[in-house]
Amino acid sequence: MSTKKDKFSLKDKFYMEIALKLANSRQGLTGTNPSVGCVIVKNDKIISIGQTSFDGRPHAEFNAIKNCIDDLDGSKMYVTL
């Protein structure tokens, strides 16, 4: 049994779960690229999401940044890859 303390908060796990759901929804639809999900959070609020596009490009991170209308300064990105 491990004695290491979990380094991820419940909020981190919550946002990563959303990113995983985004990735899973594109399984098999992204060509040779992996299906990836991305969630951008700022001040405990989701400000953007992204997924790997059909046929694999653009990538999830690019899509999330492109779709974001808020300032990204101070935000955190959760990515499944």
Give names to the regions the model predicted.
Residues 19, 37, 44:
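Conserved hydrophobic/aromatic pocket- or pore-lining residues that grip, position, or stack substrates
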Residues 25-28, 34, 47, 53:
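Generic detector of intrinsically disordered, low-complexity, polar/charged segments
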